[in-house]
């Protein structure tokens, strides 16, 4: 499988990043997006170079393609995405259960923008989303929500993505750590 799978493009938009507080979690959102099949990561608002560089280093070592953008207006990005024919999936604990809607979302061939909040998400995103998807109805991590949603969207096929361009690859091992250098 190539990143984006049958949809061509799947991007993750991270809202409300607070540089002094969210570096690690936001970096993990981006890394989960990459590992679970998205084509890219978009950081709304402030451009946190620490997060951007961290993700780019992972892509250089482990392969891509995976794009990173930052400093965009989340509202404008969502509107642009919809105007371009894509659909918007907002992950929230107040939406429809992921297991009930993931097959319907996966059946649509349209490009996907997955919106993940950090702090209180504005009403705009609930209203503009084609889908408000709940991964559980209890407070938990946006990293977990994204991983579960992308797993359902790609039906587990993200495990077979071929990451070209990197020079490291983990080899399966019952015990210990095995990392192979490519090329």
UniProtKB/Swiss-Prot annotation:
A biological process from GO: tRNA nucleoside ribose methylation
Similarity comment: Belongs to the aTrm56 family.
Keyword tRNA processing among record annotations: yes
A Gene Ontology term for the protein's cellular component: cytoplasm
Positions bound to S-adenosyl-L-methionine: 91, 117-121
Stated name of the protein: tRNA (cytidine(56)-2'-O)-methyltransferase
Quaternary structure and partners: Homodimer.
Catalytic activity, as annotated: cytidine(56) in tRNA + S-adenosyl-L-methionine = 2'-O-methylcytidine(56) in tRNA + S-adenosyl-L-homocysteine + H(+)
Compartments, as annotated in UniProt: Cytoplasm
UniProt keyword terms in alphabetical order: Cytoplasm, Methyltransferase, S-adenosyl-L-methionine, Transferase, tRNA processing
Molecular-function annotations in GO: tRNA (cytidine(56)-2'-O)-methyltransferase activity
